[in-house]
Amino acid sequence: MDATLSTRRHSHLDSLLIETQRVFEVVFGHPVAQRPSPANAFPNLLLSPKDRRHAAGLMRINHVGEICAQGLYFGQVLVARKQELRRHLLKAAQEETDHLSWCSDRLYELESRPSLFNPFWYSGSYILGVFAGLLGDPWSLGFVVETERQVEAHLEKHLQVLPESDARSREILRVMKVEEARHADQADHAGARLLPSPITGAMAWAARLMKVVAYRI
C-alpha cells in the first residue's frame, strides 16, 4: 500500500514537472517544430525598416495567437472527459506548436521579439480552456471551433496587409490558415456545440485587445 501510494505521488510529481517544463518552453522558450518551416521555400529578402517593423508586429500577433492556442488546448486536455477528445486536442496542439515555432523563428529573422505579455496571454487562455472543458466535451469543442474560425479570419486579413516582399511570413501564414480551418472542421464534425453570441462576442473583443497590444509590445 505504501509502495503504491509512493508510486502515485512520484507519478503526479513527474506529471507536474513535465507540465511545468512544457509551459516554460511555450511561454519563455522556443518550442521545437516537428516539421520544417514553410518559410524555407523562400529567400530571406531584406525589407525596408518600415516594412520590417510592420511584418514583425503582425507576426508577433500571430505568435501570441499560438501561445493562446497552447493555453486553450492544454487547459481543455486537463479536464477532458473522453480519451478521444484528449487525443484530438493533443494532435491539434502539436500542429499549433509547429506554428508557434515558425512564428518565433520569423520574428527573430525580422530582428524583433515575442510579446512581453506572453505569460498573461497564456494564463488567460489556459483558464478559458479549463472553463470550456468543465462545461462538457461538446462545449469544449465549440470553443475550439470559434477560436479557430476567428484565427482563420485574422490570418486572412494579415495575408492581405503583409508587405508584398515578405514571402517568408506570407507562406507561414498561408499554411497556418489551412491548418486552423482543418482544426475547426474536425472539432465541428466531432460534435461541437454552437457557442452563444455573448460568448463569441466576448472572445472577439478579447482578440481585438490582444492584437492592439501585441502589435507593439
Curated annotation (Swiss-Prot):
Spell out the reaction equation it catalyses. Answer: a 5-methoxy-2-methyl-3-(all-trans-polyprenyl)benzene-1,4-diol + AH2 + O2 = a 3-demethylubiquinol + A + H2O
The UniProt keywords, alphabetically, are: Cell membrane, Iron, Membrane, Metal-binding, Monooxygenase, Oxidoreductase, Ubiquinone biosynthesis
UniProt entry tagged with the keyword tRNA-binding: no
Give the CC-aspect GO terms.
Answer: plasma membrane
Name the pathway. Answer: Cofactor biosynthesis; ubiquinone biosynthesis
Q: Where does Fe cation 1 bind?
A: 66, 96, 99, 180
Where do the annotations place Fe cation 2 binding?
Answer: 96, 148, 180, 183
Q: What does the entry's cofactor note say about binding and number?
A: Binds 2 iron ions per subunit.
What Pfam family is a match for this entry?
COQ7
Family designation: Belongs to the COQ7 family.
Job description of the protein: Catalyzes the hydroxylation of 2-nonaprenyl-3-methyl-6-methoxy-1,4-benzoquinol during ubiquinone biosynthesis.
Protein name stated in the entry: 3-demethoxyubiquinol 3-hydroxylase
